[in-house]
Amino acid sequence: RLRLINAATNRIFPLKLSGVDGKIVALDGMALDTPRDFEDIFIAPAQRVDLIVDVSDKLIIDQLLRDGFFRLGELPIEGENLQRKVSPIDALPKSSKPKPSSPNRELELVMMGGAMGGAHGGDNIWSLNNVSDMPAQPWEKFDKNETVKIKLVNQTAFPHAMHLHGHHFYELKDNGEVGDFRDTTLIGARASQDILCCFDNPGTWMLQ
């Protein structure tokens, strides 16, 4: 089992893995219903990807670039498993959290700023709903176990990952269907992503 973690602050890594074959089994620590094949893996800041792989050669991790690749690392493989048993890759145990019900309310959080991002109402380079840096008061307050739909709107010229502390949420597909269960979603430039979250963990949590 191999876990990839993007610990960078703002770099999105498109990765290519060589020397292994297998499937993605979890995203941000939450098991997928069905393990997925992979070729290239895109991992945004704070995101995690878990794989179960069969190692056939030296593991090579390359970052894909416009004009080639940059080698991030290599893991040498030594010895041979003489008792190897071939079996299908099964799904990991599912989260005990049920899929949330219909939302009690719907909110919108708009990211603005940065180079080519245009003016906004904040007083720094970036803003969320026209507020820069930490607000004087929490953006919103929720009752325990309240289900909320949030539209994350990226009006900047760059893709941006949004990470919610203390909770996981469901990404919603364009048709409204429930997608992956994770705590960090990548939003493309001039794009948006709807998420559905049941706020069941009391506390003061950052969304960044």
What are these regions (language model features)?
Residues 1-103, 172-188:
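Histidine- and aromatic-rich segments of cupredoxin/plastocyanin-like copper-binding domains
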Residues 24-37, 108-208:
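Active-site pocket scaffolds in enzymes
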